[in-house]
């Protein structure tokens, strides 16, 4: 259904087409519509990616290169699907010193953060005298890192996916990213990859890249898992191949929610609202406030901010904020703002307030929570340290940000000594008999004792 905009007088003042809603005046169906994202229904994409996946599975490099030319409009062949050492070296000469410095700054902070996340290799606890149980963590043997490029170049995604994987100790890492028309890979992406510790990059994007790392080709080695955000094509391919490869957390088009109280200026809220709205027309971006003043100031400031942005990014953000997946939501109280935020479960959430910690305890459903007036999403996306690859489409209700633990697997460890064995055997035997498992029972019966007495 189409939501009906509220308080049209605000729109008239600014001469902008920004979706504006009074939350308390929406019925249940309209509130549910506000929660929808652009990729809520990807059934059409599931059908479209099917022949691409099958072609890569059966034709390998030939199909991968063909789709690179047809879909990415790039000069790629079967011979140049993998980035060479010379291309890596050349990238460092193409990147400005200031960008190189900022990439290194971000990588250093991301590494510091994720090193704190790394679990101990193993822990054991004495559950009962002589009986020990614990966990052992080992890295996943091969992981593919998807770095999108459709609406820009994203070395930051390379940083966010590569660093935790390297910290986790994954031995076989490879980046897949769409090539430029000349067949090259974004120079800053290659710089970030090498500085983070990844030296394998394939020139492939979209559904065909997901298929390549799932099935493997003559050039692309198959991986056990793929992580990283992507378009609906990538999301559909991941969903289709979830029985072939671990597709990680669901990361689709960008989302942001700015929860602003009455301690801030609405122009600041509008400034931060545009951060994720400019990613593309499939993004989602809402300013949520119970302050009419903040709402009016935000609407008044948007044209000023747009005037300072590039034409492409302005167009993207206007599409989002005037459409069905973005705008300004005016609530009747701060409690109603909390209600909407938790129902929405955003990817990025800013608590834009001079006193953000008074709001934090009321938020239960958000993947990333940025506090105060000096922590815009920009800083989190590029350099703060916490991972910016986050679950979208309300998956923040069950998933968290990409982390070191996404690149390791856990094995439980058990060790029962001879003195502790009889007590555990007795209780295990009782439950085995009750559940009707005769072999379970025999394994902790006198039959075992007899074999133990015989020895080797």
Swiss-Prot record:
Organism: Rhizobium meliloti (strain 1021) (Ensifer meliloti)
CDD domains, A to Z: Histidinol_dh
Cross-referenced InterPro entries: Ald_DH/histidinol_DH, Histidinol_DH_CS, Histidinol_DH_monofunct, Hstdl_DH
Family that this chain belongs to: Belongs to the histidinol dehydrogenase family.
GO molecular function: histidinol dehydrogenase activity; metal ion binding; NAD binding
Coiled-coil portions: none
Protein name: Histidinol dehydrogenase homolog
SUPFAM superfamilies reported for this sequence: ALDH-like
Cofactor binding note of this UniProt entry: Binds 1 zinc ion per subunit.
PANTHER family: HISTIDINE BIOSYNTHESIS TRIFUNCTIONAL PROTEIN (PTHR21256:SF2), HISTIDINOL DEHYDROGENASE HDH (PTHR21256)
Enzyme Commission number(s): 1.1.-.-
């Amino acid at each position: 259904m189409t939501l009906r905009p509220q308080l049209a007088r605000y729109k008239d003042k600014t001469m902008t087409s920004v979706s504006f809603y009074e939350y308390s005046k929406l019925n249940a169906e309209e509130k549910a519509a506000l929660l929808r994202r652009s990729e809520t229904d990807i059934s059409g994409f599931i059908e479209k990616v099917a022949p691409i996946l099958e072609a890569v599975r059966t034709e390998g490099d030939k199909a991968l290169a063909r789709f690179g030319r047809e879909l990415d409009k790039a000069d790629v062949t079967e011979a140049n699907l993998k980035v060479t050492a010379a291309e890596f070296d050349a990238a460092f000469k193409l990147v400005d010193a200031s960008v190189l410095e900022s990439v290194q700054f971000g990588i250093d902070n991301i590494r510091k953060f994720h090193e704190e996340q790394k679990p101990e290799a193993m822990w054991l606890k004495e559950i009962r005298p002589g009986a020990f149980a614990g966990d052992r963590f080992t890295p996943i043997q091969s992981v593919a890192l998807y770095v999108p490029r459709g609406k820009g170049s994203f070395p930051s995604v390379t940083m966010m996916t590569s660093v935790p994987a390297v910290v986790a100790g994954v031995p076989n890492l490879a980046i897949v990213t769409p090539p430029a028309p000349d067949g090259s890979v974004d120079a800053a992406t290659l710089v970030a990859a090498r500085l983070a510790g990844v030296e394998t990059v394939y020139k492939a994007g979209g559904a065909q890249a997901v298929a390549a790392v799932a099935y493997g080709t003559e050039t692309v080695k198959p991986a056990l898992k793929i992580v990283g955000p992507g378009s609906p094509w990538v999301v559909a391919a991941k969903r289709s191949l979830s029985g072939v490869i671990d597709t990680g957390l669901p990361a689709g088009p960008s989302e942001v929610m700015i929860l602003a109280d009455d301690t801030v200026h609405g122009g600041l809220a509008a400034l931060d609202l545009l951060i994720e709205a400019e990613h593309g027309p499939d993004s989602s971006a809402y300013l949520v406030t119970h302050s009419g003043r903040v709402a009016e100031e935000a609407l008044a400031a948007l044209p000023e901010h747009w005037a300072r942005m590039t034409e492409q990014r302005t167009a993207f953000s206007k599409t989002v904020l005037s459409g069905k997946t973005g705008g300004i939501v005016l609530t009747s109280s701060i409690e109603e703002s909390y209600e909407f935020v938790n129902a929405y479960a955003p990817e990025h959430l800013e608590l834009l307030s001079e006193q953000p910690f008074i709001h934090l305890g009321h938020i239960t459903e958000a993947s990333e929570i940025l506090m105060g007036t000096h922590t815009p999403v920009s800083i989190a996306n590029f350099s703060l340290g916490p991972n910016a690859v986050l679950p979208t489409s309300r998956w923040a209700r069950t998933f968290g940000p990409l982390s070191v633990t996404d690149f390791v697997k856990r094995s439980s460890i058990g060790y029962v000594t001879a003195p502790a064995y009889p007590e555990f055997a007795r209780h295990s035997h009782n439950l085995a008999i009750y559940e009707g498992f005769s072999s379970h029972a025999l394994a902790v019966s006198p039959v075992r004792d007899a074999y133990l007495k015989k020895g080797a």
